[in-house]
């Protein structure tokens, strides 16, 4: 790319809308055929303002897509054992088809133990070890929603990953690690980077595809990006700022996701899609 060219924006909002419209049509069909609408249970521990906002947003999106939502608000003093009891109850409730535990839950909660209380058939957020293993082996199951949304966006823009060098900056269990596995499944050569990586900039400069998912505002600079690279900014920091220095990268990348309007809407769209799929599976509706 020349210095005067700018990257094409990857429109997560528009592509997410199409996914949600398809999910809504499937939800309506399920309701018509079974008399039961798909149901997503959201579980929130405490009253962190950002988490409250995220849950409210997800429930609103459910309503627009014809998905029922059941909200369980637990006090900040909830113990891991109490949270596990709540999640186990929802896992055994036939009226609930998907379960979302909003995280982080607080430093006193063993989140991994809590996630594992979610039945795999209802793990529509793709957070359990079962879901990660199924995804890694290419078996049926639910993917982590943000990685799933990223892959759908890459597909929508016809990004050929075979033989490409993809650098994932971040190694969280629900974003960095799974998106790397999904990229690998598309025949990309994947490098993971993290807080202990020596000379991060040099690593990123070798990438054909960059996924920034570390939660550090503007960590990825313009000079870090190979001209013509595809840049996925999965970070979201205060002030609507991602992990990528957007303005600086805009004149070097070929494709880039904006923040907001890129990865975020795709994450919610995949959550709704997987909730509908979970309901279809549990209610015996072939799609």
Curated annotation (Swiss-Prot):
Pfam families, sorted: THF_DHG_CYH (PF00763), THF_DHG_CYH_C (PF02882)
Entry keyword annotation includes Hydrolase: yes
Residues binding NADP(+): 170-172, 195
SUPFAM superfamilies named among the record's database cross-references: Aminoacid dehydrogenase-like, N-terminal domain, NAD(P)-binding Rossmann-fold domains
Signal peptide per UniProt: none
InterPro entries for this protein: Aminoacid_DH-like_N_sf (IPR046346), NAD(P)-bd_dom_sf (IPR036291), THF_DH/CycHdrlase (IPR000672), THF_DH/CycHdrlase_cat_dom (IPR020630), THF_DH/CycHdrlase_CS (IPR020867), THF_DH/CycHdrlase_NAD-bd_dom (IPR020631)
Cellular component GO terms held in the UniProt record: cytosol
Keywords assigned by UniProt, alphabetized: Amino-acid biosynthesis, Histidine biosynthesis, Hydrolase, Methionine biosynthesis, Multifunctional enzyme, NADP, One-carbon metabolism, Oxidoreductase, Purine biosynthesis
Keyword Ribosomal protein in annotation: no
Gene Ontology molecular function terms on file: methenyltetrahydrofolate cyclohydrolase activity; methylenetetrahydrofolate dehydrogenase (NADP+) activity
Biological role: Catalyzes the oxidation of 5,10-methylenetetrahydrofolate to 5,10-methenyltetrahydrofolate and then the hydrolysis of 5,10-methenyltetrahydrofolate to 10-formyltetrahydrofolate.
Subunit structure, as described in the record: Homodimer.
HAMAP family for this protein: THF_DHG_CYH
Protein name (database record): Bifunctional protein FolD 1
Organism expressing this protein natively: Streptomyces avermitilis (strain ATCC 31267 / DSM 46492 / JCM 5070 / NBRC 14893 / NCIMB 12804 / NRRL 8165 / MA-4680)
């Amino acid at each position: 790319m020349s210095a005067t060219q700018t990257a094409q924006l990857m429109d997560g909002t528009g592509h997410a809308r199409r996914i949600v419209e398809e999910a809504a049509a499937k939800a309506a069909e399920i309701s018509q055929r079974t008399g039961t609408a798909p149901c997503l249970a959201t579980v929130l521990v405490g009253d962190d303002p950002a988490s409250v906002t995220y849950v409210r947003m997800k429930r609103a999106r459910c309503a627009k897509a014809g998905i029922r939502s059941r909200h369980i608000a637990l006090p900040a003093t909830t113990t891991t054992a109490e949270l596990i009891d709540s999640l186990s109850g929802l896992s055994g409730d036939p009226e609930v088809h998907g379960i979302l535990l909003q995280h982080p839950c607080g430093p006193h909660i063993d989140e991994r133990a809590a996630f594992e209380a979610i039945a795999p058939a209802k793990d529509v957020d793709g957070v359990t070890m079962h879901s990660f293993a199924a995804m890694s082996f290419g078996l049926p199951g639910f993917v982590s929603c943000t990685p799933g949304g990223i892959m759908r966006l890459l597909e929508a823009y016809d990004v050929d990953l075979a033989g490409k060098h993809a650098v994932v900056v971040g190694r969280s269990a629900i974003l960095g690690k799974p998106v790397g596995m999904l990229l690998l499944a598309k025949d990309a050569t994947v490098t993971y980077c993290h807080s202990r990586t020596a000379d991060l900039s040099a690593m990123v400069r070798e990438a054909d595809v960059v996924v920034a998912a570390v939660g550090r505002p503007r960590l990825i600079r313009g000079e870090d990006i190979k001209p013509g690279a595809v840049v996925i900014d999965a970070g979201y920091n205060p002030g609507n700022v991602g992990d990528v220095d957007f303005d600086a990268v805009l004149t070097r990348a070929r494709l880039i996701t904006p923040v907001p309007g890129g990865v975020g809407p795709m994450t919610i769209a995949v959550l709704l899609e997987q909730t509908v799929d979970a309901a279809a599976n549990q209610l015996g509706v072939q799609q």
